Amino acid sequence: MLPKISLAAVGLTVGGILTITGFVAYALDYATLNLAGFFYGIPLVLGGLALKAAELKPIPFSQPTSEKIIALRNQLATPTQNQIRKDVTRYRYGQEAHLDESLERLGLSPTDEERPVLTSLLEQDWEGKYVLTLTFTSPFISLETWQEKQEKIAKFFGPDLEVTVAEPEEKVVTVNLISQLALP
C-alpha cells in the first residue's frame, strides 16, 4: 500500500499544515507552536517539492487483473516478472523513466529523447501460462530493432521466461514476458 502513495504529496500536505499552523501561531503569539510549525513545516514543504520534481508516476494496468490471473501469477510468475510489475506500479524517485536502465543495457535507448516509454501493463493467461505484457510507445525504435533484441531481452530478464515482441499499432510495441514455469 505504501508504494502506491506519493511521498511528495505526503510531504507537501504535512509540511503545508505545519507551516500554516506556524503562521497562525505567530499571529496569535504562541512562540513554541510557531517555532515547531516553521522548523518542521518549511523543510517538509521543501522536501515535498524536491520529491515532486523527481517523481515518476506508477504505470497503470490497461485492464484490471482478474482473480483467476492473480492466482495464476501467484503460482507461475517468475521473480523477474514480479519485480518488474512491482517496480513500475509504484512511485519512483530520481529516475528519468520506468525501466530506463534496462532499456539502455539492451541497446533500446540510444538517447533520452529516443527512449521508448512504458505506457501500460497487462497480465494475461496464455494457454495456462502467466504472461506480463509491457506496452511501450516507441516512435524512434522500429519493430525490427525490437525483434533483433528479442533473444537479448529474454536472456536479460532471466531464466524461465520466453519473450515475444509485437506491434499492435504503429509506433506501439508490446513485449510479452511469458513464464515457462509449470504448475506444481
From Swiss-Prot:
Keyword S-adenosyl-L-methionine annotated: no
Keywords: Membrane, Thylakoid, Transmembrane, Transmembrane helix
Keyword Iron annotated: no
Location within or outside the cell: Cellular thylakoid membrane
A GO CC term assigned to this protein in UniProt: plasma membrane-derived thylakoid membrane
S-S pairs: none
Membrane spanning stretches: 5-25, 31-51
InterPro entries for the chain: DUF2854
Bilayer topology: Multi-pass membrane protein
Protein name (Swiss-Prot/TrEMBL): Thylakoid membrane protein slr0575
Species in which this protein is naturally found: Synechocystis sp. (strain ATCC 27184 / PCC 6803 / Kazusa)
